[in-house]
């Protein structure tokens, strides 16, 4: 089951037909699909009307540098800002919960089902992660990340922990190349995997997205295409029962798995329920034409558990005192974070 993208600010008849394909479960939106709030609202409404099946509409609206919609929306600080700028730990938790709540509320008000969040990678040295991470120490990030998760869950948005089992300790950016993490297995299990294990045990993750990283001391395949990581560790050892998304199979980090069809087959066989394939329209056609895997009815319905279960009116949301106060505070925090970065 694929989650794919569209080219621009309007949707073509061909894109409607592709989104209606039985093997397509959802759509991911990018900045290129956005002009302003009115255009975006109209686009999503048209897609909902013309694609008659339930479609999972998704986005990366984490905050900081990974925020697809900006003009007309709250500028959210990067996740590192909460722990770095807070005067005491409880303040960081409150800020994170505010951000999770507001982000989810704004997306629901657009009729977007979920944002792929939170990032549970540890550390800031990785080019792909950086200040997207809540922090470096497990004990530091758990309460802050939990605040963000609880804010999302208060609205009713499904949570997606990424990038399992941890992308933070490699320098390379998996958008551009396949990173290799050569640390001992014990290091990964005693450090990187801890946030995932913690939130799985508390039943606070609806979904998990594995990394396009090869952990050489554990398995020769990227985690996104690894039976070891997804079946043995995630499903059996950690007892995760939610949805597994692949990370974008169009990324260079997935090149080790072959062409787009081979990548998709490997990810499915490894245990992914839903596959992201972005910025590769020819690749999407290749996969839809070549994939022999046919999900059963139960598997086809599984992703519906991630859809939003409430309707929020943007005007009503924007007029509420809680929203106004939270928006003002988070945008001030965002500016403080930008200033902090210039001096450190």
From Swiss-Prot:
Protein name: Beta-hexosaminidase
EC main group: hydrolase
Swiss-Prot/TrEMBL catalytic activity: Hydrolysis of terminal non-reducing N-acetyl-D-hexosamine residues in N-acetyl-beta-D-hexosaminides
HAMAP family associated with the record: NagZ
GO molecular function: beta-N-acetylhexosaminidase activity
Subcellular location: Cytoplasm
Residue positions binding substrate: 60, 68, 132, 162-163
